Regions:
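Short Asp/Glu-rich motifs
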Residues: 76, 166-167, 173-174
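Short, charged/polar surface micro-motifs in flexible loops or helix N-caps
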Residues: 77-81, 88, 122-124, 165, ...
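Conserved hydrophobic/aromatic beta-strand scaffold that supports enzyme active sites
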Residues: 28, 115-117, 182-184, 205-206
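Small-aliphatic-rich amphipathic alpha-helix that forms the alpha element of a beta-alpha
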Residues: 57, 116, 122-170
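A glycine-rich helix N-cap at a beta->alpha junction
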Residues: 106-108, 171-196
Length: 231
């Protein structure tokens, strides 16, 4: 039986869900795929859909109710201004490339119909910072899943501009804050094939008091590192 709890908020009654059998949701989680930014086309989410996406993103496990994140939305109305910030940032590091090429490069970065950035903003409280970072990561993944659930493709990226001081200043970040990612959202013009995924058995260990227990997750990582170095 579905376990729910009724809660009152201003003018509406909502039900929280502790568990709900959904083969459709499980199938989606087992097959979801990020879409390259260049393949994201119009239309993007409507304002009501964006609100739903952000509400879903903010509904995460959060030790201490810190809410250690906030969102910045870049829409068509202010995309040109943000592009100029990227151009200026690129000029700082590369004063030899012409303006036309920089504008083209910045335009490609901003090509998705909707862009949302997630700001990690850990509170100076008793909750360990790394636990707050995990909460931010959960919010990021919820944002991706919510946009997917509304029928949109998403690409979650950081890239160089998440760490650029010019961009940080333009995003009005404080010293303790960081950009957890830019989320490029739109209709998937083309869905890519799946990438290599680890077998879950390689990542799973059933605990035992035996000290010789193999750390399967670590073993998989070591194997992957060797494979990557051999390329």
């Amino acid at each position: 039986m579905l376990k729910t709890s009724e809660t009152n908020s201003e003018n509406k009654k909502d039900q929280t869900i502790a568990g709900h059998h959904s083969s459709e949701l499980l199938h989606y989680l087992l097959h979801r795929r990020s879409v390259p930014r260049k393949n994201l086309i119009e239309p993007g989410p409507t304002e009501p859909e964006l609100k739903q996406i952000l509400e879903a993103a903010s509904r995460v496990s959060d030790h201490g109710k810190m809410v250690p994140f906030w969102f910045t939305v870049i829409t068509e109305n202010n995309k040109d201004e943000f592009e100029q910030i990227l151009i200026n940032a690129m000029k700082t590091d590369d004063d030899k490339t012409g303006d036309d090429k920089l504008e083209k490069k910045a335009g490609k970065l901003m090509s998705a119909p909707l862009i949302v950035s997630m700001i990690s903003s850990p509170r100076r409280e008793s909750i360990p910072a790394w636990e707050q970072f995990m909460c931010v990561g959960a919010a990021c993944q919820n944002l991706v899943l919510a946009a997917n659930a509304l029928g949109y493709g998403v690409n979650w990226l950081t890239e160089w501009y998440s760490y650029d001081e010019n961009v940080r200043q333009a995003m009005h970040l404080e010293d303790h804050e960081n950009i957890a990612g830019f989320f490029f959202i739109g209709t998937a013009g083309e869905v890519p094939e799946d990438r290599d995924r680890p077998e879950v058995e390689e990542l799973t260990t059933f605990w035992s008091p035996d000290s010789s227990l193999v750390k399967k997750g670590q073993k998989y990582i070591e194997k992957k590192d060797k494979k990557d170095k051999g390329r």
